[in-house]
From Swiss-Prot:
Key words, A-Z: Chaperone, Cytoplasm, DNA-binding
Cellular component terms per the entry's GO annotation: cytoplasm; nucleoid
Pfam families per record: DnaJ, DnaJ_C
Keyword Acetylation set for record: no
Localization per record: Cytoplasm, Nucleoid
Name by which UniProt lists this protein: Curved DNA-binding protein
Highest taxon of the lineage: Bacteria
Domain J: 5-69
InterPro entries in the cross-refs: DNA-bd_curved-DNA (IPR023859), DnaJ_C (IPR002939), DnaJ_domain (IPR001623), DnaJ_domain_CS (IPR018253), HSP40/DnaJ_pept-bd (IPR008971), J_dom_sf (IPR036869)
GO molecular function, one term: unfolded protein binding
SMART domains assigned to the protein according to its UniProt record, in alphabetical order: DnaJ (SM00271)
Signal sequence, start to end: none
Gene giving rise to this polypeptide: cbpA
């Protein structure tokens, strides 16, 4: 058998770090992938690159390979390694060859340790109304299966029934232990993380734990005061608009905001004064009477002053 020069195959130096080797592997894997490459020997080159990566990507295997490469001209190495059959060494021969040259203890010491599986993140959209109480949700996601080279080989569809707790906030992460990818060599599974995304609401804006809603009122309602029906996340309430209210004024409704374990926010009604359509002759006359009665009022009196 012939001991291959994995560094030459990858186009890297023995002193290069793993990041450099990984970059080279990805470039060569794309270049020689049988599905995309037009090279006549693409499949063989792809397998050769994958074999080199399998050894050089593992710190312990790489150290053992370097030791074997260093001893490749030693008589003991040649007796144990070369059989005169013209075959080439590959990664599957590693255990037998290495242990025969350097001892059974070396073989046992290079067994890969248990490795934890990968975590998975998926985004879960939640409506504002759903944040008030715990609710059940069926979620579907794809569970990736990795090959020996750390590449996704396939994706397995998976469905779970989960509970979304009350009071979740935008960007909050919920951990589902052990629902990620399987561990290796007896290692624990990774976790599934649900990342909460609060869906935009047509009426409410979120400000911390509080909610804001724009309430349209007429000029006379703002001037004289009135009561208007305003929706909340649970039910509608009757909101008092005090006389002399201004555009942009915020009226607080206590305890009608978002709910969490620590506190309940408030709802703020932001007044928006809406003018009626272009007035007819009679309406214009009424507006003129109002203007005459308030002739001393200058809305721009303090405009631009600090």
């Amino acid at each position: 058998m012939e001991l291959k020069d994995y560094y030459a195959i990858m186009g890297v130096k023995p002193t290069d770090d793993l990041k450099t080797i990984k970059t080279a592997y990805r470039r060569l894997a794309r270049k020689y992938h049988p599905d995309v490459s037009k090279e006549p020997d693409a499949e063989a080159r792809f397998k050769e690159v994958a074999e080199a990566w399998e050894v050089l990507s593992d710190e312990q295997r790489r150290a053992e390979y370097d030791q074997m490469w260093q001893h490749r001209n030693d008589p003991q190495f040649n007796r144990q390694f070369h059989h005169g059959d013209g075959q080439s060494f590959n990664a599957e021969d590693f255990d037998d060859i290495f242990s025969s040259i350097f001892g059974q203890h070396a073989r046992q010491s290079r067994q890969r340790p248990a490795a934890r599986g990968h975590d998975i993140e998926i985004e879960v959209a939640v409506f504002l109304e759903e944040t008030l109480t715990e609710h059940k949700r069926t979620i579907s996601y794809n569970l990736p299966v990795y090959n020996a080279f750390g590449m996704i080989e396939q994706e397995i569809p998976k469905t779970l029934n989960v509970k979304i707790p009350a009071g979740v906030g935008n960007g909050q992460r919920i951990r589902l232990k052990g629902q990620g990818t399987p561990g290796e060599n007896g290692g624990p599974n990774g976790d599934l993380w649900l990342v909460i995304h609060i869906a935009p609401h047509p009426l409410f804006d979120i400000v911390g734990q509080d909610l804001e809603i724009v309430v349209p009122v007429s000029p006379w309602e703002a001037a004289l005061g009135t009561k208007v029906t305003v929706p909340t996340l649970k039910e509608s309430i009757l909101l008092t608009i005090p006389p002399g209210s201004q555009a942009g004024q915020r009226l607080r409704v206590k305890g009608k905001g978002l709910v969490s374990k620590k506190q309940t926010g408030d709802l703020y009604a932001v007044l928006k004064i809406v003018m009626p359509p272009k007035p007819d002759e009679n309406t214009a006359a009424l507006w003129q009477q109002l203007a005459d009665a308030q002739s001393s009022f200058d809305p721009r009196k303090d405009w631009g002053k600090a």
